[in-house]
Design a protein with these regions (language model features):
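Short, well-ordered beta-strand micro-motif
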Residues: 40-42, 53, 156-160
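Short acidic (Asp/Glu) patches
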Residues: 24-25, 35, 64-74
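Conserved beta-strand in the GNAT
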Residues: 47-56, 60, 85
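Charge-rich, low-complexity intrinsically disordered segments
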Residues: 153-188
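Short amphipathic alpha-helix that is part of the acyltransferase structural core
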Residues: 1-51
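Feature marks short, surface-exposed loop/turn motifs that line or immediately flank catalytic pockets
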Residues: 56-58, 128, 163-165
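A short, polar/proline- and glycine-enriched secondary-structure boundary/capping micro-motif
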Residues: 60-65, 97
Length: 188
């Protein structure tokens, strides 16, 4: 399941999870003030086990531009207002597996559909990139080559979120089919 971060306590849990994972992996910490929405992956036992953060994309102003020239990509130039950045995809070590990833990916699709985003941009670890491509069949394209950034090698990618939310039946990992029928947890 997934849920949107709504309270200060949930924000504290969100920060605790991604900071713990970043420190485990040796990444530099970077906090974000401006977000569209933050999500928590929730285990079947009700534990918060993962995070994802959707940030607005401001053509040429996101730090991600220092790694790859997203602003020059034709799909982004076409309609930058329908682009967002997904960041802080993190799962606590002892919960890593397909379900939390499915839940976080589902939260991303849910958010993209809710806000009418067409594309998400991101920097992915090469192993995670491969898993998304092979296991989850995420429609995405590389926007640049692999390079070192803030503690690890990353691959800059563009996700076709609109393709996923317009073709939900093609993605068996998706944990919701429409905005009113999902594995999203209601606010407590």
């Amino acid at each position: 399941m997934f849920k949107s971060v709504k309270s200060e306590w949930e924000l504290a849990m969100f920060n605790s999870i991604w900071v713990s994972v970043w420190e485990e992996k040796g990444y530099e910490l970077e906090y974000t003030n401006q977000v569209v929405e933050r999500f928590l992956a929730v285990s079947d036992d009700g534990e918060y086990v993962g995070t994802s953060e959707i940030k607005p994309y401001l053509l040429g102003h996101n730090e991600i531009e220092s790694v790859a020239p997203f602003r020059h990509h034709p799909k982004i130039i076409d309609d930058p207002a329908r682009v967002a950045e997904i960041d802080k995809i993190a799962i606590l070590q002892h919960f890593r597996g397909q379900q939390p990833i499915s839940d976080l990916l589902s939260s991303a699709v849910y958010c993209a559909e809710k806000y009418n985003f067409r594309y998400f941009i991101s920097l992915l670890e090469p192993v995670f990139y491969r898993a998304l491509r092979i296991t989850f069949h995420i429609p995405m394209e590389k926007v640049g080559g692999k390079q070192f950034y803030k503690g690890d090698d990353v691959i800059p990618v563009l996700f076709d979120m609109e393709h996923i939310y317009r073709n939900k039946k093609q993605y068996d990992w998706l944990t919701y089919q429409n905005s009113s029928d999902n594995r999203a947890m209601p606010a407590l």
